[in-house]
A protein has these predicted regions:
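Bacterial N-terminal signal peptides that target proteins for export
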Residues: 2-16
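Boundary at the C-terminal end of the N-terminal hydrophobic targeting segment
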Residues: 27-30, 35-38
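Soluble non-cytosolic domains of exported or imported proteins
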Residues: 38-46, 61-65, 82-83
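Exposed beta-sheet edge and beta->alpha loop/turn motif
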Residues: 110-165
Length: 165
């Protein structure tokens, strides 16, 4: 086999490389977050970033796959209030639609006080609108998730009204 031009990959190999690249892209698109779960090595900011990535691709590879990841990082106290995954998913879809399939998210500086952390986030939704949220996390003191940062609550911060001068 001769390359069609100096330095180019022979034609049969170009097709093979293209197919391999497309297959790799399909795997990444199908599961952009991977298997994310609480771990003591994850910082509060890393936990929020993982949850935001899951929300940005909420229905990949299957419906609510991203919400299952977010629920996996919900603290035991949060889970007791929000119920099983199905109820949690409905609550997020109804109460936080701007977070689903959002375009971008930028983290503010983290505020920590011992085993409690507040992580501000500015998010641009799929329609291009800006939203601000605060994630409250706590470091779990015992049990299955000992020393893991997990989300206790998320609330939207209303825009400040403009002051006329």
């Amino acid at each position: 086999m001769r390359p069609s031009a100096p330095g180019l990959i022979p034609r049969p190999f170009r097709l093979l490389l293209l197919l391999l690249a497309l297959a790799a892209g399909s795997v990444l698109a199908a599961d952009p977050v991977g298997r994310a779960e609480p771990h003591p090595a994850l910082s509060p900011a890393a936990v929020v970033q993982l949850q935001l990535a899951a929300l940005a691709f909420v229905d990949r590879p299957t419906r609510d796959a991203g919400l299952a990841i977010v629920w996996g990082f919900a603290s035991p106290g949060n889970r007791s209030l929000t119920g099983p995954l199905k109820r949690f998913a409905a609550m997020i879809r109804d109460g936080y639609p701007a977070m689903l399939n959002h375009r971008t998210a930028v983290l503010a500086p983290l505020v920590m006080d011992g085993a409690v952390a507040l992580q501000g986030v500015e998010l641009i939704d799929r329609e291009g609108r800006r939203h601000r949220y605060v994630f409250q996390l706590s470091k779990q003191p015992d049990g299955e998730f000992r020393d893991c940062w997990m989300t206790d609550s998320v609330f939207e911060v209303p825009d400040e009204p403009e002051v006329a001068t």
